[in-house]
Amino acid sequence: MDSNTVSSFQVDCFLWHVRKRFADQELGDAPFLDRLRRDQKSLKGRGSTLGLDIETATHAGKQIVERILEEESDEALKMTIASVPTSRYLTDMTLDEMSRDWFMLMPKQKVTGSLCIRMDQAIMDKNIILKANFSVIFERLETLILLRAFTEEGAVVGEISPLPSLPGHTNEDVKNAIGVLIGGLKWNDNTVRVSETLQRFAWRSSHENGRPSFPPKQKRKMARTIESEV
C-alpha cells in the first residue's frame, strides 16, 4: 500500500476529529455540519477499503499534523492561505430535505464512476425538480454532496450521491449522472426541471425553463441502460 495513501487517510481522520469537536460545541453552521456527516461516511468507506482502523489512524494523523505545525511559521501560513483558491458551498436543499427518509416501490440503481444513482420508477405523470448541495470553485462544480429529485408534494423520488468507498468525481461525472437520472424519470412521462443553481454550475445543456430536452430515442436508451445494470 502506498505510504502517501495511508498518511493522507490518517490526516483526514484527525482533521475530521477536530471538526467534530468544533461541532460538538455547537459552533458549526449548516454547511459545516452537512460536510461533517458526509465526510464521516467517506472515511468509514476508505478505512474499510484500506483495512485501517479509524481510531488508530486518527492518533497517527495527530502526530503528523503536530509535526507540521511545529515547523510552520505564521508568515508561511498566511502565504499558503492567500495562494489557495476558495470554494463556495451552495445549497438548494434544507437540512430537512437532505435527511428526509424515502423508499422506492420500483427501485432502480446505477453506479457511474464514483456516483450512485437511485430512482423510483413507479413514479408517473409527476412534476419533478432536481435540487443539490455542492461546492463550487472557479465557477464550476467542485464536489457534489447530494442531489435529490422531489415531486411538487415534497416526496423524494430519486437521488445521486457519492460512494463513500470511491471518493472523487468530476464535473462531467455529475453531468452524466444527472442525464441518466433525468432520462429514467422522464421515461414514465414525468416532467423534470433542474434548479437554477444546478443549471448554472452543473447542467448547462438545458433550456431556459430548466427542462433538459431528450429525444424519445435517447430517453428509451437511458432507461434501458438503468434497467440492464441493476
UniProtKB/Swiss-Prot annotation:
A motif (Nuclear localization signal) lies at residues 34-38. Belongs to the influenza A viruses NS1 family. Upon interferon induction, ISGylated via host HERC5; this results in the impairment of NS1 interaction with RNA targets due to its inability to form homodimers and to interact with host EIF2AK2/PKR. InterPro entries: NS1, NS1A, NS1A_effect_dom-like_sf, uS15_NS1_RNA-bd_sf. Residues 180-215 are annotated as: CPSF4-binding. A motif (Nuclear export signal) lies at residues 137-146. The dsRNA-binding region is required for suppression of RNA silencing. GO terms for molecular function: protein serine/threonine kinase inhibitor activity; RNA binding. HAMAP family: INFV_NS1. Residues 206-230 are annotated as: Disordered. GO terms for biological process: symbiont-mediated suppression of host cytoplasmic pattern recognition receptor signaling pathway via inhibition of RIG-I activity; symbiont-mediated suppression of host gene expression; symbiont-mediated suppression of host mRNA processing; symbiont-mediated suppression of host PKR/eIFalpha signaling; symbiont-mediated suppression of host type I interferon-mediated signaling pathway. Residues 1-73 are annotated as: RNA-binding and homodimerization. It holds the Pfam family Flu_NS1. It comes from the Viruses. Its main location: host cell. This is Non-structural protein 1. Inhibits post-transcriptional processing of cellular pre-mRNA, by binding and inhibiting two cellular proteins that are required for the 3'-end processing of cellular pre-mRNAs: the 30 kDa cleavage and polyadenylation specificity factor/CPSF4 and the poly(A)-binding protein 2/PABPN1. In turn, unprocessed 3' end pre-mRNAs accumulate in the host nucleus and are no longer exported to the cytoplasm. Cellular protein synthesis is thereby shut off very early after virus infection. It comes from Influenza A virus (strain A/Equine/New Market/1/1977 H7N7).
